[in-house]
């Protein structure tokens, strides 16, 4: 199946006929035949054939089979497979037939190829607008504006929006929230570590669509921006940079000078990222921009720490932490990436020239003191032998009962190691049933050491070297070099037993790729178990809703198993812990002991607390060198940005926030911590709703990675970029030279022609259209490019409509019906109010797929139906008809641009500003215009149904014209003895003609006897038939055979439906909807059979 689909050229895309109207489908729904057919051969693929073709998945090329039968019951796998094979044959046959027909007819034209039409180059658009001023709108007749160019359309508007303050919250005259309510979102602060990626663009697209929508609904709206200092991430990037540039470490600079270097980095990349955000159209209130290391937010961080420390929630303890040797700091569990290996595997480790072996279980023997026995144990980390302080066996294991209480001899150190019994630490059935215990380097062993009061011996320095505890022969050796040497010496001592493959999980640092070492370190911890209970309760009680439900379930699971949080980091960039060690004169005290630490918002406060604690002692204070985990300051974001701990107006107005929108991957890093700290420090939830969006992957479903070369810079999608330039960007990052070549190959596979210019509006719309509530988004750049073409549709339609309205057109002061509307106007206004209702409801439910597809569909109704149909009204109608058609056209453009504004802010502003304005319009920008809502007077179902009949007649007439290859001067007859249908068709003859290019007139009759001989028939419904005069156009025998085939197919379909209806238990098991659908289908099929039989008789008479 894929073979012939994948060999296709992209020379054309069919426009399919919908059941109601002709339209272009979104790129994701296009059925593209890409076989080696020329553009001239397209017409030989008949529309009737297309109607019968099965749908195909545009990405995989696989046929899509409906898994349900007509009565709603599921098909069996065998039935599905049979139907699939049949569909594939049909597709192959259709493609062959189209090519065959084309080859037979276009031979002559191929001998005389037409000259290619020379396309005049479009001159470059030069925007002369002064930054911050309202954009100078050049006439659309200007050659530079002939075609849609996103760069032209999107220029100047953002600076004007900022200058005019349209993004700032709007209050009533007395400074209160507007009656419509408040809507506010705290934007997740991006790290100041380089550049935004497409995931940031998705976040902004979703958030800003909701912000703009609610602003247009009249609410007091705040979209609060800011940036995160990103401690580990930023420091590690700057360290890499200064090493690559100057061959210096941070220690060469010293703390103060190095932090100065990081601030320089921050200033440069902060402005770069801010520019990217503005290019994305985010309607942030920049007057409230926040930064986690600003003096204001630092005050909030210090306040939070001191309060929690004084309450005992923050405490000092020496525990195992995840130590990154490369970064020389502890990292949280959430910053650890686990790599699973099945067996012996070689991995690259920072600081080692050769790869290191993992996935191996090494067995060796400990000599039992006082006997010739040896106790065999197994380990994946032989180098930790120097930290062993016990060997544990199960108390019920008969093999070792005689060894209870005895000792073994360490092979490299003069250390006697006790043999202990422990039910929790030992599984008798696993391995030898004897386990080495290394309390200072393994979490399970740590717990065992606590139970048995064992010695905790740390064998590693912060740099991952063996320390003095290992003896002079080993001290200073790298940990993984020591692993090899330990095995060698065990062999020399005849204590080595063997190795075997071992499936295992290896913890790595997500920032550096280093192998994590569990190290015993004194750190600051947050006790979370009690806070977690409150966080669970507010979600269960509905004070916070989490969408989707899968994320809510993960939230409960994580909080139900929460551990205390290590918040100190051995870094220089960040908030220095506001806690001080009390050095009492003449005394020595352990820094692990929390009794000798005081927290203070200032040194003066700390001195007062220390003096109160030790009133009769002389002391000095020394502030902790460590900084706080970045997620601690980020956890305060919803209230620190509003001025907490001060009782500001912003805190009173906007806290708690309406919602928090972010990726589900940082639900635990960030979202839960904001809830925990918000409840603890403010007594309130920080937001009322959490919406977790999907993660963006590439078109093949792979995670985006610099090394794969599939990371997408949103600016490259907006402006376009060549493949060579994509390659060049790889050299600007911190990728290893070996990774660069791999990434280049990945880029060539993903973007062989580079990335086309799509513009911000198309990218935003595509990202929102992708948001379906799933876990992942497989982003295809071609789909984004498809929405650029949609932008062109909007641009050209508005341009054409403005020409139709004329320069002197002035819309009525208020919107509404005049009473002079034609049927097509009533129909399109019904569609407008219907779409407005659907979109409002969808956005309120965060249903972005429904909202974007409904708006997309509505624009195509305007372009392909109303504008086409209104041409004759505006050109040839009476003065009243012309005025009504123009007023309706204005209503459509005004509302359609407003509907799409939250998703496409730039093109909607550009084209809306070109529309004439009602005298009552108060908004200077579409940003502040009112969002379209349901209007009951437009909800004319009867008129809508009547015009749907017109469109169905049009569809069937087009189908016949295409099938019989009649390209002009076609003669169409509509037959109906149903009074209402007859009147509709008669009244709308001009509409039908305007929608069908190949005919000059339509005749409407009441009886089939009025149809001339030589016509073929297509049934619209049981009461309406469309006839096309084919006499003189076709081979009669061939057409009789063709109609006979259709008749046989229709009869077969009728039999199938009747079998379903007459089947056992149908009346009791089939639902009402299925029964109604089957009855309607049967009625239509019967009418089709009668019409086809009449057509055959008619064609036979032509032969006489």
Swiss-Prot record:
The modification Phosphoserine is found at residues 73, 294, 332, 707. ATP binds at residue 706. GO terms for biological process: valyl-tRNA aminoacylation. A motif ('HIGH' region) lies at residues 190-200. InterPro entries: aa-tRNA-synth_I_CS, aa-tRNA-synth_Ia, Anticodon_Ia_Val, M/V/L/I-tRNA-synth_anticd-bd, Rossmann-like_a/b/a_fold, tRNA-bd_arm, tRNAsynth_Ia_anticodon-bd, Val-tRNA_synth_C_sf. Pfam families: Anticodon_1, tRNA-synt_1. A motif ('KMSKS' region) lies at residues 703-707. Keywords: Aminoacyl-tRNA synthetase, ATP-binding, Cytoplasm, Ligase, Mitochondrion, Nucleotide-binding, Phosphoprotein, Protein biosynthesis, Transit peptide. One of its GO terms (cellular component) is mitochondrion. Signal peptide: none annotated. GO terms for molecular function: aminoacyl-tRNA deacylase activity; ATP binding; sequence-specific mRNA binding; valine-tRNA ligase activity. The modification Phosphothreonine is found at residue 1003. It catalyses: tRNA(Val) + L-valine + ATP = L-valyl-tRNA(Val) + AMP + diphosphate. Residues 1-47 form a transit peptide. Belongs to the class-I aminoacyl-tRNA synthetase family. Present with 358 molecules/cell in log phase SD medium. NCBIfam families: PRK05729.1, valS. HAMAP family: Val_tRNA_synth_type1. This is Valine--tRNA ligase, mitochondrial. It comes from Saccharomyces cerevisiae (strain ATCC 204508 / S288c) (Baker's yeast). The lineage of its organism: Eukaryota, Fungi, Dikarya, Ascomycota, Saccharomycotina.
């Amino acid at each position: 199946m894929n073979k012939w689909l994948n060999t296709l050229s992209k020379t054309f895309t069919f426009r399919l006929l919908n059941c109601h109207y002709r339209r272009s489908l979104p790129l994701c729904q296009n059925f593209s035949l890409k076989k080696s057919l020329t553009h001239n051969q397209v017409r030989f693929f008949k529309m009737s054939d297309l109607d019968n073709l099965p749908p195909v998945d545009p990405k995989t090329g696989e046929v899509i089979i409906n898994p349900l039968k007509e009565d709603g019951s599921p098909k069996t796998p065998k039935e599905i497979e049979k139907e699939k094979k049949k569909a594939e044959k049909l597709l192959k046959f259709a493609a062959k037939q189209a090519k065959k027909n084309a080859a037979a007819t276009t031979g002559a034209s191929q001998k005389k190829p037409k000259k290619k039409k020379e396309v005049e180059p479009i001159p470059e658009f030069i925007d002369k607008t002064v930054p911050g001023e309202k954009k100078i709108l050049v006439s659309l007749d200007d050659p530079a504006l002939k075609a849609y160019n996103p760069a032209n359309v999107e220029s100047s508007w953002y600076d004007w929006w900022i200058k005019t303050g349209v993004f700032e919250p709007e209050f009533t005259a007395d400074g209160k929230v507007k009656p419509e309510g408040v809507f506010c979102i705290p934007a997740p602060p991006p790290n100041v570590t380089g550049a935004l990626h497409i995931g940031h663009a998705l976040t902004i697209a979703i958030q800003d669509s909701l912000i703009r929508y609610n602003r247009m609904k009249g609410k007091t709206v705040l979209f609060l921006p800011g940036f995160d200092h990103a401690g580990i991430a930023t420091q590690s990037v700057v360290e890499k940079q200064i090493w690559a540039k100057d061959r210096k470490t941070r220690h060469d600079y010293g703390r103060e000078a190095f932090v100065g270097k990081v601030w320089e980095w921050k200033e440069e990349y902060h402005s770069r990222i801010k520019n990217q955000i503005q290019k994305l159209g985010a309607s942030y209130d920049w007057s409230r921009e926040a930064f986690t290391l600003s003096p204001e937010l630092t005050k909030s961080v210090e306040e939070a720490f001191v309060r929690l420390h004084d309450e005992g929630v923050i405490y000092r303890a020496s525990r195992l932490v995840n130590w990154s040797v490369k970064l020389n700091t502890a990292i949280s569990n959430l910053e650890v990436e686990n790599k699973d290996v099945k067996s012996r595997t070689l991995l690259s480790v920072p600081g080692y020239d050769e790869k290191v072996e993992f996935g191996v279980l090494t067995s060796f023997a400990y000599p039992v003191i006082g006997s010739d026995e040896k106790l065999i144990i197994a380990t994946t980390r032989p180098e930790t032998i120097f930290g062993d302080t016990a060997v544990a066996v199960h108390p019920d294991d008969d093999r070792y009962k005689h060894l209870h209480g005895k000792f073994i001899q360490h092979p490299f150190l003069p250390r006697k190691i006790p043999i202990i019994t422990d039910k929790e630490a030992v599984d008798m059935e696993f391995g030898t049933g004897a386990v080495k215990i290394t309390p200072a380097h393994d979490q399970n062993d740590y717990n065992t050491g606590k139970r048995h009061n064992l010695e905790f011996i740390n064998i590693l320095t912060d740099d991952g070297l063996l320390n003095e505890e290992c003896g002079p022969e080993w001290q200073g050796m790298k940990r993984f070099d020591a692993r090899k040497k330990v095995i060698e010496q065990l062999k020399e001592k005849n204590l080595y037993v063997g190795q075997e493959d071992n499936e295992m999980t290896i913890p790595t640092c997500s920032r550096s790729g280093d192998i994590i070492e569990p190290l015993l370190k004194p750190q600051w911890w947050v006790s979370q178990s009690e806070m977690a209970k409150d966080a669970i309760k507010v979600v269960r009680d509905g004070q916070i809703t989490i969408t989707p439900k899968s994320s809510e379930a993960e939230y409960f699971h994580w909080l139900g198993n929460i551990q205390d949080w290590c918040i100190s980091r051995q870094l220089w960039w960040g908030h220095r812990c506001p806690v001080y060690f009390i050095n009492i004169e003449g005394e020595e005290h352990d820094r692990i002991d929390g009794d000798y630490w005081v927290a203070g918002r200032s040194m003066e406060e700390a001195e007062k607390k220390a003096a109160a604690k030790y009133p009769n002692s002389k002391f000095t204070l020394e502030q902790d060198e460590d900084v706080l985990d970045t997620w601690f300051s980020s956890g305060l974001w919803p209230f620190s940005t509003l001025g907490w701990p001060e009782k500001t107006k912003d805190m009173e107005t906007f806290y708690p926030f309406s919602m928090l929108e972010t990726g589900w991957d940082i639900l635990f890093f960030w979202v839960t911590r904001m809830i925990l700290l918000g409840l603890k420090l403010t007594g309130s939830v920080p937001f009322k709703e959490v919406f977790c969006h999907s993660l963006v992957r590439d078109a093949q479903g792979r995670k985006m990675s610099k090394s794969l070369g599939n990371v997408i810079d949103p600016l490259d999608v907006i402006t376009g970029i060549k493949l060579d330039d994509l390659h060049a960007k790889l050299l600007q990052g911190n990728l290893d030279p070996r990774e660069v070549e791999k990434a280049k190959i990945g880029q060539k596979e993903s973007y062989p022609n580079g990335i086309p210019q799509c513009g911000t509006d198309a990218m935003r719309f595509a990202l929102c259209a992708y948001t379906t509530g799933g876990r992942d988004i497989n982003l295809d750049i071609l789909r984004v490019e498809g929405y650029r073409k949609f932008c062109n549709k909007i641009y050209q339609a508005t341009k054409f409509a403005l020409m139709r309205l004329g320069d002197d057109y002035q819309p009525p002061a208020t919107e509404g019906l005049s009473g002079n509307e034609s049927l097509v106007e009533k129909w399109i206004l019904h569609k407008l109010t219907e779409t407005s209702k659907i979109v409002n409801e969808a956005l309120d439910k965060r249903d972005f797929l429904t909202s974007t597809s409904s708006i997309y569909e509505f624009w195509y109704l305007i372009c392909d139906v109303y504008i086409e149909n209104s041409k004759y009204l505006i050109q040839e109608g009476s003065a009243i008809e012309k005025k009504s058609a123009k007023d309706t056209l204005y209503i459509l453009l005004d509302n359609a641009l407003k509907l799409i504004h939250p998703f496409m802010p730039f093109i909607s502003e550009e084209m809306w500003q070109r529309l004439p304005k009602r005298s009552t319009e108060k908004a200077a920008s579409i940003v502040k215009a009112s969002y379209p809502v349901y209007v009951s007077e437009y909800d004319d179902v009867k008129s809508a149904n009547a015009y749907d009949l017109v469109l169905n007649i049009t569809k069937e007439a087009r189908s016949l014209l295409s099938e019989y290859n009649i390209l002009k001067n076609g003669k169409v007859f509509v037959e109906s003895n149903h009074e209402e249908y007859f009147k509709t068709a008669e009244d709308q003859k001009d509409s039908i003609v305007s929608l069908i290019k190949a005919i000059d007139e339509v005749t409407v009759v009441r009886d089939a006897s009025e149809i001339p001989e030589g016509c073929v028939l297509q049934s619209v419904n049981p009461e309406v038939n469309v006839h096309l005069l084919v006499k003189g156009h076709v081979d009669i025998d061939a057409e009789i055979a063709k109609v006979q085939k259709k008749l046989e197919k229709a009869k077969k379909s009728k039999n199938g439906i009747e079998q379903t209806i007459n089947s056992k238990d149908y009346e009791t098991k089939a639902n009402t909807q299925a029964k109604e659908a089957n009855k309607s289908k049967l009625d239509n099929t019967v009418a089709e059979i009668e019409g086809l039989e009449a057509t055959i008789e008619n064609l036979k008479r032509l032969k006489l």
